[in-house]
């Protein structure tokens, strides 16, 4: 169910039913010569709706603007500062909490947002009274299912970064009319030193952001091996893992600082 399409009375009922609210977070930024600017926003919203269908959650409107400085030199990219982005998230979540929603998930689809999403969630909790009954999850949608996606990939490690096998396959599976694979001909898109789903990503080291050029067409990784079939498999894997994550929380597993049960499952 979509929050934006509810009346306020229906939203009140959702509060009374103690429904989880999923806040999808994307970006508006360059994604190579072959994908649209709204890839992250679309993917966040699409995954959120599939998750909501299975766990009975409410989906808030997807946030299309975030911390996208990496690609600000590429026309069409829109960015917020990290500070502004964090504050927007804090105020969105606090608004939901003020109405009585007790469970919120910030579902990110843009890797550079990760630290800001985490900071925003922590700030919301810091502002609560100790012992308040409220829980906010902060995660990127691929994280719970990363190992499953990694097992399905065709690219080498470093091939799943940005406008890559992962994102291109996702778009081929869901919006093929917006994907232009023919525009990748002759494009140089090397593997990169980090990867969305491979285990053991090293400590991050940052360098100056790339300038727009034919030599760097806003791609990190390898989109040439992407396919609709892979995209559907990736999508199924990440949604299944997210459902399992939500079910664990609903079972009383608690948040990151809850005491871990030592009881052996029987």
Predicted regions, residues:
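Extended, histidine- and acidic-residue-enriched regions that form the cofactor-binding/catalytic faces
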Residues: 1-105, 109-266
């Amino acid at each position: 169910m979509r929050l934006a399409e509810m009346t306020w009375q229906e939203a009140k009922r959702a509060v009374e039913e103690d429904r989880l609210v999923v806040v999808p977070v994307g970006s508006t930024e360059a994604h190579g010569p072959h994908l649209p600017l709204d890839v992250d926003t679309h993917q966040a919203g699409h995954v959120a709706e599939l998750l909501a269908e299975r766990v009975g959650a409410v989906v808030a409107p997807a946030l299309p603007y975030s911390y996208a400085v990496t690609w600000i030199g590429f026309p069409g990219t829109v960015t917020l500062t990290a500070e502004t982005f964090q504050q927007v998230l804090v105020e969105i979540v606090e608004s939901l909490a003020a109405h009585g929603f007790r469970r919120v998930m910030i579902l990110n689809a843009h890797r550079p947002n990760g630290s800001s999403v985490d900071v925003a969630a922590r700030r919301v909790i810091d502002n609560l009274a100790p012992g308040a009954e409220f829980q906010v999850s902060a995660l990127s949608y691929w994280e719970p299912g990363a190992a499953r996606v990694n097992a399905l990939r065709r690219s080498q490690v470093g091939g799943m970064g940005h406008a890559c096998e992962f994102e291109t396959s996702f778009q081929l599976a869901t919006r093929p009319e917006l994907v232009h694979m023919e525009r990748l001909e002759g494009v140089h898109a090397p593997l990169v030193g980090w990867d969305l789903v491979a285990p053991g990503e090293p400590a991050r080291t940052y360098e100056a952001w790339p300038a727009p050029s034919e030599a760097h067409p806003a791609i990190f990784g390898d989109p040439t091996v992407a396919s609709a079939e892979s995209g559907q498999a990736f999508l199924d894997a990440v949604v299944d893992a997210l459902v399992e994550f939500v079910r664990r929380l609903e079972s009383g597993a608690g948040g990151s600082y809850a005491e871990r049960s030592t009881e052996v499952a029987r």
